[in-house]
Structure formats: structure tokens, C-alpha cells
Regions:
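An N-terminally biased module of ancient metal coordination in phosphate/nucleic-acid-related enzymes
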Residues: 1-80, 163-170, 181-240, 244-256, ...
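Extended substrate/RNA-proximal surfaces in nucleic-acid metabolism proteins
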Residues: 2-5, 61-212, 268-271, 275
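His/Asp/Glu-enriched, well-ordered alpha-helical/loop segment
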Residues: 216, 257-280
């Protein structure tokens, strides 16, 4: 009976979506790699927002395979979506140029938030803002939420996203998004697989047909918050278009226990299929 139960819940060995301090995660790359090892993972993809800066440090940790990745901020049908680049070459000049362009806009947006929040009576300490800029290549809204929390303007991080940041969103410059076609192209030029991250629930078969025509390689079919029905739908689309399916925790910090490494991920067979597609 135990063997039968084990067969129903095969071991998760790979997490192909996680963030470090190189973008908006709480763990340094090496600390995250150690955390993944402690979670009994064999493989971890470092997929920071719009940067590959954390990959090299993570690779210094022995005993775990690190997949070089990135999560690009992408424009599709006038909306922002996210695309994972997995098994990329972190030294690829084209990929770095795209990341650098988005990084500059992210830093500009951080300063926009600082100014807008000060204008409504919520100043953020300059030394702490400068610290974020020094540590993170690609600062994001999570950093702003942390700064608001540290300054005592909110009691918990979630308040920032629900109550505070929407008030100033219209006064903050946006990110410099890359078109999804260009994002897929640059990931391919960097030797990687282009995977749609946490696909929006409203995407239908026609939209996935468009993405197939753009040479998308796969979808993240298992992630935090996705329903079994949606996972089944994504797997159907993957079968129809010859895509791979990936899964990951989307880890940012230990404060979200449902998003820690080892909680959501891939079995050995599932990971092997993706690695084969990537030529690994």
C-alpha cells in the first residue's frame, strides 16, 4: 500500500521557477540553492526578473544542478505577461542587452514610486532605497512594499499591494517591456527554451495558437494558485502544439509557505522531458 501511495505522489526533484536578491527575492542565490538542497531537490532554475545576475553565484553551491534562467517582462496584446527563459547562456550578449534595458526602466520606476509615495505623505528613507538599488539588479514592487513595511507605513506587506500602491500607480513610469515575439527570439538566440510563466486564466485556445505561431516552447502548467482544470487545459494545449510543460514554486521568500522550493515542482520524468527538449 505504501508503494502504491508513493506512486501516486512521486518525488518532486526539480523547481524551474525561483527568485533571488538579484531581483525581488529575499534569499541570495547561494542561500536559495542551499534551501533547495535542504528541500531534497536535485535541480533548481534561477529565474530572476529581467536579469541573469544571480545564476553564477548559485552555481557555486555543490550538490544541486542549477538551470540558468530568467523571467522576462513581456508585452502581449497590450498587457504585461511573463516569460521564462530556461537553459539560457547567461553570457549571451543579446539576452543581456534586453535585460539591461528593462533593468534601467525598473530602476526608474523604483524612484518614481519613492517620489509618488512621498507626495501622499509616505516618505521612504533614502539610505534604504539606495540599499535596494545596490543589492537588486531589477527592483520591483515587492521592494517598495518592504520599504513601506520597514518605515512603519503598513502593518503587513499585502497592504502595500491592495491599499497603497494602487493609489500612486498612475504617477509611476512603467517598465520597458519587450514584445513577446522579441522575447522568444532572444531566448532562442541565448540557447534556451521560451516558456509562458503562470499563464493567465483567460487565455483560450485561439491565443495559444497565436503563441505557437511565435515559436513558444512550452507553458508552466503547475504553479501556485492554478486549478486542476486549468492544469489539464494547459497540458492539452501543450500536446496540441508540441510544447513542454514546466512547474515551479515561484519562490520569492519564506514568508509565503505555499511557494517554497519542494512544494510545487517536477518529477524526474517530467524534468527529463524538458531537459531533452533543451538538448541537455
Amino acid at each position: 500500500m505504501c508503494r502504491q501511495l508513493a506512486g501516486l505522489n512521486p518525488r518532486i526533484v526539480a523547481d524551474l521557477h525561483a527568485h533571488t536578491t538579484a531581483s525581488d527575492g529575499d534569499d541570495t542565490p547561494s542561500r536559495l540553492a542551499v534551501r533547495a538542497k535542504h528541500a531534497k531537490l536535485d535541480v533548481l532554475a534561477i529565474t530572476d526578473h529581467d536579469t541573469v545576475a544571480g545564476v553564477a553565484e548559485a552555481m557555486t553551491i555543490p550538490g544541486i544542478t542549477i538551470v540558468a534562467g530568467v523571467e522576462l517582462s513581456v508585452s502581449f496584446r497590450d498587457h504585461e505577461v511573463h516569460m521564462l527563459g530556461l537553459f539560457v547562456d547567461p553570457a549571451n550578449a543579446d539576452l543581456r542587452a534586453v535585460c539591461d534595458r528593462i533593468s534601467v526602466s525598473r530602476r526608474r520606476r523604483l524612484r518614481g514610486y519613492v517620489e509618488a509615495l512621498a507626495s501622499i505623505g509616505l516618505p521612504l528613507p533614502e539610505h534604504r532605497v539606495a540599499s535596494v538599488e545596490a543589492i537588486s539588479t531589477c527592483p520591483g514592487r515587492r521592494h517598495v512594499a518592504n520599504l513601506l513595511l520597514e518605515a512603519g507605513h503598513i502593518r503587513q506587506r499585502s497592504q502595500a499591494f491592495v491599499e497603497v500602491l494602487p493609489k500612486v500607480a498612475g504617477h509611476v513610469p512603467g517598465k520597458d517591456l519587450v514584445s513577446i515575439a522579441d522575447a522568444i527570439d532572444v531566448v532562442h538566440r541565448a540557447g534556451g527554451l521560451a516558456i509562458l510563466a503562470h499563464p493567465p486564466g483567460e487565455f483560450d485556445g485561439a491565443i495559444y495558437g497565436e503563441l505557437a505561431a511565435l515559436k513558444l516552447d512550452g507553458v508552466e502548467s503547475k504553479h501556485n494558485g492554478v486549478s486542476l482544470t486549468q492544469t489539464d487545459f494547459l497540458k492539452e494545449q501543450a500536446t496540441r502544439h508540441g510544447w513542454v510543460c514546466t512547474a515551479g514554486s515561484d519562490f520569492h521568500g519564506a514568508d509565503s509557505p505555499d511557494r517554497v522550493p519542494g512544494r510545487i515542482g517536477m518529477t524526474s520524468a517530467e524534468y527529463a522531458a524538458v531537459a531533452r527538449r533543451a538538448g541537455r
